Amino acid sequence: VLDAATKAVFQSWGPGRYDAYFNHDGKNAPVLIPPAYGLRDVALETYTGEGPISYWNSYVAVTQMHGQGSFNDPRLGINIVAQPDRVTPKLPVLRDYQLTLEPPQPPAGSFDPIAAERGRVVFNGSGRCASCHIPPTYTDAPLLHAPAETGSDPVLAGRGTTGRYRTTPLRGAWQHPPYFHDGSAATLADVVAHYNTTLLLGLTAQQQADLVQFLKSL
């Protein structure tokens, strides 16, 4: 049974957000739940790259859902042993299923194809997007990046085990605003504007608009 204070914290998160570390460190800093699709061939599937998706499935099942299973991560100081372990044997087939989930295709008419082609040039060139969001997965995982590299909020990275963020894959990005792990960018235009300012890209308004159309096409 939840006490009133804990219940109030949970209710404060709102739809689409979750704090998987709250019951570990007691801090209230929920993040957006990332998409479960488009993870095939992506080396690290979580924001902070602690491990493969089976690691995260195990963490959530045991530490969050209180499933009867074992979970051990010395980096977090967690060592839960259950007998019998009803979680670990299920992880491989769950991962296999998750990796079959394809990103949704953009609806017809939802982007300007001519502008998107111009945006592709910006993406691969002056926008420097492809230096980290490398096609066809649009990530450079297993590389991880310090928050300061991209002007990202450092809170989640500091609560995890790596202190860094993976590069989020972009396929299906049109479908899940807001953006960044903390939801600080309401639209893809806001994402582009953030990087244009943070990385001193010097993109024109037209280049930024074209880049948004390309992102909508993925």
Question: Where are the language model's segments positioned?
Answer:
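Periplasmic c-type cytochrome electron-transfer domains
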Residues: V1-L218
